[in-house]
Amino acid sequence: LLKKFAVLALVALTATVSASAPRADTGPDFLLPDLRQAPPGCAGGSSGELPLCTAWDVCPVIDPAAPNGRCVAPSVAKAVRLRFTSAEENVGDGPLVLYGRRESTQQATMTVRQALRTGTDGSIPGGYRAAQRATGAFTYYEPALAHQHWHLMNFEHFALVSRQGKTVVTDRKNGFCLGDRFEVHDAGRLAHVPGDTGPDADLAATLRENMCRHHEPTALEVLEGISVGSGDDYKFTVDFQWLDITRVPTGTYDLVNTVNADRTLLETNYRNNSSAVAMSISWPQGMPEPGGTVPAAPIVRLLRSCPGQPRCA
């Protein structure tokens, strides 16, 4: 339903808005963001080196369908989850600024436009109608208890991939409420980190507190974004920050996180949009039988971290 609605909304957006909105390929030079995906399991703000990637665990749960769940003893568990923190950073020249909007609460999702910072006077559009660029993205109100705010959907994807390149498991959760949650480890080398005053500083102050219309399912507009030199992360204990590995055989795999996979958001560079960690999975007492409990939790070891690379094993 959401996919169908998103397609219809994008068609309507193109027909009704694009004629009056400024074009992104004309006028002054724009300073664009560069989204860098951190390796999965690495806390926000770390360099992605393997010893620092400790923000993950193996969690047996009773209900395989629950968004979250208390980790329990394998003897009563029906599923095993690999939980991991995910983080995305902006290391570009300009902020990532996205405005979502819908006409009424009868629409389940909001269409999204990307606002671009000008390089001449530093101005940043202040709302949806002024934003220069239509996107294929949309926002959706996530009702799960740990969220209850508007998510930018399809922003990031998780996948467990075999050494032969076959995707074994993919994510359910791929939406984010974006804001400035941490400083990137190499912020000192970036030329356009917000200062103390000006449009970038004003935007950063807003994004540091941005909760994406928390507890506001009837909102008609929402802001999502990340300033230069900042990043957004979701901790591994949050709803949907996991892959179900109950049926994954013993072996070596890549855990791959990818941001802006469809390139609907304009960036200076797409080469660093995926990062991976190589890991081994083994079942000391064999895999669970379908519908049964877990004989023993699998042993999972991180072998390598590969920042900016989609393959690692």
PLM features per residue range, with description:
Residues 24-313:
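Extracellular/luminal regions of secreted and cell-surface proteins that mediate adhesion/ECM remodeling
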